[in-house]
């Protein structure tokens, strides 16, 4: 007697646990399916009163061992105050950001908040696009034997790193931080980019007791000030007199004085099912519409994306890198790539030559180094390698273009008021015919055409071309498909023996290869899969795991022991189920569920029951759809 179970899984769903109960000669199959959704409302705990003074933490702050509003918090931002003002220097405006932060470390993981990073701009090609970070001070306060021990950060703990031709990163570490430490730090960022006000976030991955953003804008600068996020802030706006000294003249005007305050703000935690958690943090966004200085200047700053297109095409460090020589022309000629008729195959073969000669350094960038330096080092960012790939493809007659974007972990691109600052990387799009394009990025180690890392699968990316520029939704490009077939038999002792045949396509194949590559060796990988599936593997074979192709296949001969008694055998037919536990473990979830790409898992199971046994009972299976049909779970016996 055989029973077959069809398990179809589109995207992800709740955990399904099931057992089949077999009994000798007198009963039927018993199938139990348990799906539990628990929604709880958290009660609001009493929280402490914020201390807005810096330099002398209170006894309550020093002795604090947990945060009442979030008992699981590893740390809490006790106070974060940012003042943004305009000043005049050398006859021109600049923006000054004064930032002060106080954090309490509650658990070992919270010590990571002693490591601070401050991004800023220092454009090597434009002296008018420069920022400077100064006035950095940081202190750790610890309570030891009822005495406050104060440890100041020294200058040798401050570092700077150049990310590309525009962007810098300042990093520092607060010393002597441990569980119980109160961290304080402050810095000043001075920016010549007076027409751009940085976004301000009231929340982050730990709860915030108090956050304040104070912004004063002279009447000459017409900004649209927008508040976004899930936790509303208290806002006030007043007019205030301002005075600026320009040479020997005293320039008087009025200003818009904004104040935003947030209290007892919850943590916004990132996870595998949200693109970019900061998109849902409470934040203030300022978009410049125009500048009006009476009798001197009027400038409209309502730029659109066509302006960005033109800038990139004419920029010698971006558009100027196209139509260059192919450094691997001889190797591609030897490989016969130019003679390949199928364009997609030609793109794949070209990419293989690139990856055989250049190694990705693990960094995503927008601007590239010189090709000479990249070729000499044999390594580079995805941008470095993508510039080379564009020229390689052009050399074999494939039309290819850069597709610029902001990665998922940096947030979505703004719909209006764009700037180059919004962009942080690009991929390559290659036309295989007049209407179809394939996508690839040099960071891809284990995939194929149209298989991109999830951070690059954005819904708004822009094709940059002299012919035309347009938007493309890369979420529609990727997919993940897994098909499993289990054929086995159960003996009277409850031992299942059989084979599992699996096919992994597109992003699923890339993940298979990545897991395999990261394992110490094939034996280690095999042991990991055995533990993951709860089986003993007798024989294991794979195909396509080391190839540049869209599919990986494997075959496993296995045994698995089921729970049994003298006259019963309990069987879970989902031997290769993709989920072992509920990924949504939080009591309360305020963020949406966002999947990186469409996913499908299909498992078909055929099991023969032992001779002399019959099915005790069986249920009718289950089918669950979300209201928009974007997720479907189906179990049929």
Where do the language-model regions lie?
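Bacterial N-terminal signal peptides
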Residues: 31-40
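Hydrophobic topogenic segments
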Residues: 2-29
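Secondary-structure boundary elements
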Residues: 305-377
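C-terminal soluble interaction/assembly domains
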Residues: 371, 616-637
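Proline-anchored loop/turn motifs at beta-strand termini and strand-loop-strand connectors
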Residues: 218, 604-614
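Short, well-structured beta-strand/strand-turn elements
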Residues: 193, 358-364, 396-409, 613-619
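Sec/Tat signal peptide C-region and signal peptidase I cleavage site
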Residues: 41-45
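Beta-strand-rich, non-transmembrane domain signature
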Residues: 46-307, 311, 369, 384-390, ...
